Regions:
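Ribonuclease/tRNase effector modules and their secretory precursors
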Residues: 1-104
Length: 104
């Protein structure tokens, strides 16, 4: 199977999906957010205002697709990384993690 190309402008695509309401949590993201006390408003704020961490993007052979890392600070100052992927029209929120210390 041929590896698909990465999405060219990840932040633009993320923000388009947010503006159109075309995003949803995977079950993994819902579980991890609850465990880590990360709320949907935290996630949305980081996705709207964060930066694309290209070095943290990963190809997932089991899905034959890429996940993209968006990182930023929440309004209350938490350093959060969100992993997202895209299907035809939507953005899937894969997971959310709080970064402690310097993991840039």
């Amino acid at each position: 199977m041929v590896r698909p190309s990465k999405t060219a402008n990840v932040l633009q695509r993320v923000r388009e999906c947010l503006n159109l309401g075309r995003y949803y949590d995977t079950s993994h993201a819902s579980e991890r957010k609850a465990l880590r006390n990360i709320t949907l408003p935290h996630v949305l704020y980081v996705l709207k205002n964060g930066c694309h961490e290209k070095k943290k993007d990963e190809f997932k052979p089991e899905y034959n697709d890429w996940t993209y890392a968006i990182r930023g600070r929440t309004i209350d100052g938490r350093d959060i990384r969100i992993a997202v992927a895209f299907d035809e029209k939507n953005m899937l929120i894969i997971t959310a993690i709080e970064i402690k210390g310097s993991q840039r």
